[in-house]
Amino acid sequence: MNLKVLAVFVLCAILVVVTAERRGTETGGYKKDTLQDLKKRTHDCFDRYREAACTSDNIRLLCKTSAKYQINCKKSCGLC
């Protein structure tokens, strides 16, 4: 009986140590993920608008100020 209790205790201790070592964010760092970090990790990395329109928007700095262009010109705005 004591051997079973000891085995359960050891397994619980291992679980606690492994869980405590995990980092707090998806990227593995100690800082919180920002919205920009989440946008960079998107799986659909393409421009919904024409390439010329997205390039023009990037030049006019709309990529930094407009969520509309950040979503629709991900590749040209460098968000992925």
From Swiss-Prot:
Subcellular localization, as worded in the UniProt entry: Secreted; Nematocyst
Function: Inhibits voltage-gated potassium channels (Kv1/KCNA).
GO molecular function, one term: potassium channel regulator activity
Disulfide bonds listed in the record: 45-80, 54-73, 63-77
Major subcellular location class: secreted
Extent of the signal sequence: 1-20
Protein name: U-actitoxin-Avd9b
Residues annotated as domain ShKT: 45-80
Family classification: Belongs to the sea anemone type 1 potassium channel toxin family. Type 1b subfamily.
Crucial for binding to potassium channels: annotated span: 68-69
Propeptide residues, chain positions: 21-39
GO cellular-component term (any): extracellular region
Keywords: Disulfide bond, Ion channel impairing toxin, Nematocyst, Neurotoxin, Potassium channel impairing toxin, Secreted, Signal, Toxin, Voltage-gated potassium channel impairing toxin
